A protein has these predicted regions:
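N-terminal chloroplast transit peptides
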Residues: 1-23
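N-terminal binding-site loop/beta-alpha segment at the start of enzyme catalytic domains
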Residues: 2-4, 13, 43-122, 174, ...
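Short, acidic/polar
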Residues: 77-87, 134-147
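Short acidic/polar active-site loop segments enriched in Thr and Asp
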Residues: 94, 151-154, 185, 221
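Acidic (Asp/Glu)-rich catalytic clusters
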Residues: 109-120, 145-150, 204, 237-242
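A short, structured active-site edge motif that brings together acidic residues
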Residues: 120-133, 155-161, 224-227
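CE4/NodB-like, metal-dependent polysaccharide N-deacetylase domain
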Residues: 138-158, 177-181, 213-215
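Beta/alpha (TIM)-barrel catalytic core signal, keyed to glycine-rich beta->alpha loops juxtaposed to Asp/Glu
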Residues: 160-342
Length: 342
């Protein structure tokens, strides 16, 4: 199969090659008229919660940065995606989370391209590979670039740990190659259990040997999971934090299924906030990157109003539970020889 570079039209290669000569930092790209963003590395982030703003970023283990609040597009209709993403960008989000399986990458890309007053360097776009094997992962990177019209993808994740060991290793190799080619800036996984993560570390070491040395196997920059007080995933979180991997939390609002919970409601009343805002603040103070989803303009805005209050340590502790109650699919528990596709 041809290399990543040879499969793209010349115009895209010209754009990508410009990055090595300072394209993304050139003087004509002006910073938005916002307060200077506060940047934290993952290992100190949780202790700095009081300093958070909508412009805050977390430093990844590859030196790049990710906005600490994302706008999720799960189950957003393709025909709505551009409009709602544009609305999210208008109210201050700078981080958009999509996936091949969501079928709304094109709308997200159109909104990002249409945000003429926001430099591309200030916008963070994520997508995910659905079919976990080398060829499909390689093709998915190219398809996402074509559908979105973007010159690069900020973050590409393997959506689930399906595909078998050979498929997972091959898909990861494809992401590493895409990162090396400049098509993808950061890479990672979603819904991997500890056993899948352990296997991936082995694959990374194998790829280093096969591809010519340390660093050639890539590194997990970001990992994404359903995380909230009723699905804490402490074993996975500990594994990732030990390696300074940024953790994203999807379904941080538990699909609204916990509205009216006694503790949650009490905290909302105490702080004069909505239950959704309490859950998002909990996620931020745990050091996670929450990805709330809404297509309602008022809720899109309300989900950003989480920086003018702080939960106490006791609040955070009281909200946590011993429950394991995911509201979405849960591939983290699938065996290493599990399904070949999602």
């Amino acid at each position: 199969m041809a290399s990543f570079g040879t499969r793209f039209p010349k115009s895209r290669l010209q754009v990508l090659s410009a990055s090595s000569s300072g394209f993304f930092n050139s003087s004509h790209l002006q910073k938005p008229k916002l307060n200077h963003p506060i940047t934290f590395s993952a290992h100190i982030f949780r202790t700095m919660a009081s300093a958070l703003t909508l412009q805050s970023k977390q430093k990844l283990n590859n030196g790049l940065e990710i906005p600490v609040l994302g706008y999720g597009l799960w189950k957003t209709a393709p025909e709505e995606a551009e409009e709602v993403t544009t609305e999210a960008l208008k109210v201050g989000y700078r981080h958009v989370d999509s996936a091949a399986s969501y079928r709304n990458e094109a709308g997200a890309g159109a909104a990002i391209r249409g945000a003429k007053d926001i430099p591309r360097s200030e916008l963070f776009f994520t997508s995910k590979v659905r079919y976990i094997n080398y060829d499909d992962a390689k093709d998915q990177v190219e398809e996402t670039l074509e559908k979105t019209g973007l010159a690069y993808i900020n973050l590409m994740l393997l959506h689930c740990p399906y595909g078998g060991s050979e498929g997972r290793k091959g898909a990861w190799k494809a992401l590493v190659e895409a990162q090396e080619a400049g098509l993808v800036k950061s890479i990672g996984v979603s819904n991997y259990g500890v056993h899948h993560l352990d296997e991936l570390e082995t694959h990374i070491k194998e790829l280093e040997e096969e591809r010519g040395g340390k660093g050639k196997g890539g590194a997990i920059n970001v990992a994404q999971y359903e995380i909230h007080p009723w699905c804490a995933r402490n074993d996975i979180v500990q594994w990732l934090q030990k390696r300074n991997v940024a953790i994203e939390a999807y379904s941080p609002l538990v699909r609204g299924e916990r509205w009216g919970d006694k503790t949650l409601k009490a905290l909302a009343d105490k702080h004069g906030k909505s239950e959704a805002q309490i859950l998002l603040r909990w996620s931020l103070q745990k050091g996670y990157i929450p990805l709330p989803k809404s297509v309602t303009p008022t809720r899109i805005l309300d989900n950003t109003k989480i920086y003018d209050f702080q939960l106490s340590d006791e609040d955070v502790k009281n909200l946590e539970t011993d429950e394991y109650s995911p509201v979405c699919w849960d591939p983290t528990v699938s065996p290493l020889d599990g399904p070949k596709s999602g």
